UniProtKB/Swiss-Prot annotation:
Family: Belongs to the peroxiredoxin family. Tpx subfamily.
Subunit structure: Homodimer.
GO MF term set: thioredoxin peroxidase activity
InterPro entries per UniProt: Redoxin, Thioredoxin-like_sf, Thioredoxin_domain, TPX, Tpx_CS, Tpx_Peroxidase_subfamily
Gene expressing this chain: tpx
Cysteines paired by S-S bonds: C60-C94
Lineage: Bacteria, Pseudomonadati, Pseudomonadota, Gammaproteobacteria, Pasteurellales
Summary of the function given for this chain in its UniProt record: Thiol-specific peroxidase that catalyzes the reduction of hydrogen peroxide and organic hydroperoxides to water and alcohols, respectively. Plays a role in cell protection against oxidative stress by detoxifying peroxides.
Organism: Pasteurella multocida (strain Pm70)
Superkingdom assignment: Bacteria
Protein name according to UniProt: Thiol peroxidase
Active site: C60 (cysteine sulfenic acid (-soh) intermediate)
Length: 165
């Protein structure tokens, strides 16, 4: 269990958040095409997991835009933007914004992923959604960088995540 804050109010997050050196085991999410998507779909690539509560909030949307911009410059790296949003909402947002360099994936069918990644908000107004986090994986899903953002209304440290690639 971890603690983060939402507008200064402490909330509990369930699961064990991966640390540098840990290996993240594969998990299943849903793509914009409503197809099961796993880390194995990106085998041989480094992966940035941009995890957030909902693409329809300002800070979450900003993180998707910023990682989309950086993804175009990254060789052999897939950026997965992971939230509980329905794939339709994710696709609508990326289509309207012209974002083509990131992969949006939804946990709406498999919320066990939240606990597996240590980002499952279990109390407060956002219970059932994910905490804001960034996890960078190498080609073998070993963690190169991990940040559980301490305040949900705060952006992640993009520079720190990108520096390990």
């Amino acid at each position: 269990m971890s603690k983060i804050t939402l507008a200064g109010t402490e909330i509990e997050v369930s699961g064990v958040f991966p640390q540098v050196g840990d290996v993240v085991t594969d998990f299943t999410t849903v793509s914009a095409k409503l197809e099961d998507t796993t880390l194995a779909n990106f085998a041989g690539k480094r992966k940035i997991l941009n995890i957030f509560p909902s693409i329809d909030t300002g800070i979450c949307a900003t993180s998707v835009r910023k990682f989309n911009e950086q993804a175009a410059k990254l060789a052999n790296t897939a950026v997965l933007c992971l939230s509980t949003d329905l794939p339709f909402a994710q696709a609508r947002f990326c289509g309207a914004e012209g974002l083509e360099n990131v992969f949006t994936v939804s946990t709406f069918r498999n919320k066990d992923v939240h606990k597996q990644l240590g980002v499952d908000i279990v109390e407060g107004p956002l219970a059932g959604l994910t905490a804001r986090a960034v996890i960078v994986l190498d080609e073998n899903n070993r963690v190169l960088h991990s940040e559980l953002v301490p305040e949900i209304k705060q952006e992640p440290n993009y520079d720190a995540a990108l520096a390990v690639l």
